[in-house]
Amino acid sequence: MKAPLFLAAVLALAACGGSDTASRLPDVRLPTLGGPQGPSLAACATEKCLTVIVAPWCSVCHTVTPDIVRLRRFLDKAGISSRVVVGLAEIGPIKEFAALYGSDALLDDQGVIKARGVPQFIVTNRAGDVIKRVGGFPRGASSAEELAAYFDLP
């Protein structure tokens, strides 16, 4: 009985961490919770952008949602674009979880983003080239400013 529980725990941890190796975000436009299509993931309106990928089934994603929202507010005030992509699930749970991030949350019910783990934080430049990719949530960062510094933002 312990072996199946251990295996389930290992698989759950693997699903909530990890990273991909693509050097650019895809040139796709995902719908937003508010209705219109969002900007291309491969483009960035500012010098750097932060893209956060989360999933409704990920307990870590739920736990750190308030931190992500605070980080996005901080980055907005600093003039840095950010976006949250909610995916890796059916559209109902995606929309419900996306509501916590606001009407500009991007919905990926088609699996356009191929994240191996969530949450995932991707910093890109204006052209969409990946500068930094972090799987999981950084430990020890207790404020939006510390999180921004961890991701080399602003």
Regions found by a protein language model. Name each.
Residues 17-19:
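Bacterial signal peptide processing site
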Residues 1-14:
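Sec-dependent bacterial lipoprotein signal peptides
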Residues 79-93, 102-108:
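Thiol-based oxidoreductase modules, predominantly thioredoxin-like and allied folds used
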Residues 53-70:
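Conserved redox-active cysteine motifs that mediate thiol-disulfide chemistry
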